């Protein structure tokens, strides 16, 4: 079980057109993974670095 509720949210790239490197916690694989964020929208399961993702969702 992830440490925080935001970590169970599905990856959501948002609704704009940029491709900004970001990371999210993949609950099925129990690890943080890279994805492209569009620059707007999405949800809180989005981190600037893999370290921040791991610190928040894994511990």
UniProtKB/Swiss-Prot annotation:
This protein's record includes keyword Disulfide bond: yes
Site (Not important for inhibition of potassium channels): 19
GO cellular component, one term: extracellular space
Residue ranges constituting the BPTI/Kunitz inhibitor domain according to the UniProt record: 7-57
Pyrrolidone carboxylic acid modifications at: 1
Cysteine-cysteine disulfides: 7-57, 16-40, 32-53
Location within or outside the cell: Secreted
Site residues by UniProt (May be the major determinant of the binding affinity for potassium channels): 5
Keywords: Disulfide bond, Ion channel impairing toxin, Neurotoxin, Potassium channel impairing toxin, Pyrrolidone carboxylic acid, Secreted, Toxin, Voltage-gated potassium channel impairing toxin
Tissue note: Expressed by the venom gland.
Signal peptide limits: none
Swiss-Prot/TrEMBL site (Important for binding to potassium channels) positions: 9
Single GO term (MF): serine-type endopeptidase inhibitor activity
Domain of life from the UniProt record: Eukaryota
Stored PROSITE patterns: BPTI_KUNITZ_1, BPTI_KUNITZ_2
Family: Belongs to the venom Kunitz-type family.
Note: Negative results: does not inhibit serine proteases and voltage-gated potassium channels Kvl.3/KCNA3, Kv1.4/KCNA4, Kv1.5/KCNA5, Kv3.1/KCNC1, Kv3.4/KCNC4, and Kv4.1/KCND1.
Function: Serine protease inhibitor homolog that blocks voltage-gated potassium channels (Kv1.1/KCNA1, Kv1.2/KCNA2, and Kv1.6/KCNA6) (IC(50)=0.4-150 nM) and facilitates neurotransmitter release.
Protein name: Kunitz-type serine protease inhibitor homolog alpha-dendrotoxin
Record organism: Dendroaspis angusticeps
